[in-house]
């Protein structure tokens, strides 16, 4: 692939795909988004037209099985991440996956072990580390400016992607509980915890 672009398939035609993932891939001249997949075919079609993506489909397994796809980008509802990631890893694909990979540590570790066995690259959607302010704080820690940290306290608040003209409720009352995030900790808490690990050190597995 030295002389060709990475061919990317995006699974999920939602807000993160629209405002972050697809624009990010398309800004990188080394990459090409070649297919967008969503259970709602008409939504995938709309995204394909909006972003000039050659193909759209509702068949995620067909996409994962394609030999001409290098990277699978998973930005679907949290409850679907593990199955999609696992199948992608089994197919030998590189993965960018929104957090969390799975709903429990055991499945997350299994996925990491499979990725290592397959020799593929994986990345979680923890973008806060790349914020200039967060990186500056890390530099201050590395330089010893604040001494040795022992406790990390944090809170997170933002209103990104919220339409001020619409109600704040993001989940329909009749939504399947198994298909939504279990808590705010899973959604916005996860990257804040990741920053803490990066700043002051994470847990060491023995």
Predicted regions and their residues:
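N-terminal Rossmann-like dinucleotide-binding module
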Residues: 1-51
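Receiver (REC) domain switch-region micro-motif
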Residues: 36, 72, 152
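Rossmann-fold dehydrogenase core element
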Residues: 110-128, 147-152
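Acidic-histidine catalytic/liganding microenvironments
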Residues: 28, 51, 66-67, 131, ...
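Beta-loop-alpha module in the N-terminal Rossmann-like domain of NAD(P)-dependent dehydrogenases
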Residues: 51-114
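Predominantly a Rossmann-like dinucleotide-binding segment in NAD(P)-dependent oxidoreductases
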Residues: 128-206
């Amino acid at each position: 692939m030295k002389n060709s672009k990475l061919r990317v398939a995006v699974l999920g035609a939602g807000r993160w795909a629209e405002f972050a993932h697809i624009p990010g891939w398309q800004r990188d001249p080394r990459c090409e988004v070649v297919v967008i997949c969503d259970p709602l075919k008409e939504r995938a079609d709309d995204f394909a037209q909006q972003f000039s993506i050659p193909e759209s489909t509702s068949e995620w397994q067909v996409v994962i099985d394609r030999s001409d796809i290098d990277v699978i980008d998973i930005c679907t509802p949290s409850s679907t991440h593990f199955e999609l990631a696992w199948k992608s890893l089994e197919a030998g694909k590189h993965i960018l996956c929104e957090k969390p990979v799975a709903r429990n540590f055991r499945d997350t570790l299994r996925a990491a072990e499979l990725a290592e066995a397959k020799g593929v690259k994986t990345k979680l959607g923890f973008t806060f580390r790349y914020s200039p302010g967060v990186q500056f704080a890390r530099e201050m820690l590395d330089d010893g400016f604040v001494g040795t940290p022992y406790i990390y306290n944090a809170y997170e608040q933002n209103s990104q992607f919220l339409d001020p003209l619409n109600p704040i409720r993001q989940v329909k009352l009749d939504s399947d509980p198994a298909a939504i995030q279990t808590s705010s900790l899973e959604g916005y808490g996860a990257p804040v915890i990741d920053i803490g690990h990066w700043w002051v050190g994470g847990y060491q597995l023995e």
